[in-house]
């Protein structure tokens, strides 16, 4: 993940940022990805990216030319903490944030060691996150 210090060096250079928001909970991030302090650093990075490029802008034929496009992979059993991620985007970044909600999680590698992570996301779980995004006022949703 990117630190806000390294991102500051890119100010004025990058036109489009496409970060992932993987987890909203530090304990979960550490457990499954061994990423210490992920939520805090990820949020700081998104604030910096948003400051630099703002909401995603499209030209007259629908091609993005500047802005922020956030990706979020929905995990089974809400292990990503999707509600908090959606709240953060809507309230602290912008309700105009372009959000790609992804349901293509497939358990592989060491996922079998974690029964709660060792299955695909159900259609119902994905729809719940999609509806939550709309409830938070996020409307630029892509799947």
Segments from the language model and where they lie:
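Conserved AdoMet/S-adenosylmethionine-binding subsite of the radical SAM
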Residues: 1-115
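Generic hydrophobic secondary-structure packing signal
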Residues: 38-41, 125, 129
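Gly/Pro-rich active-site loop or hairpin
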Residues: 112-124
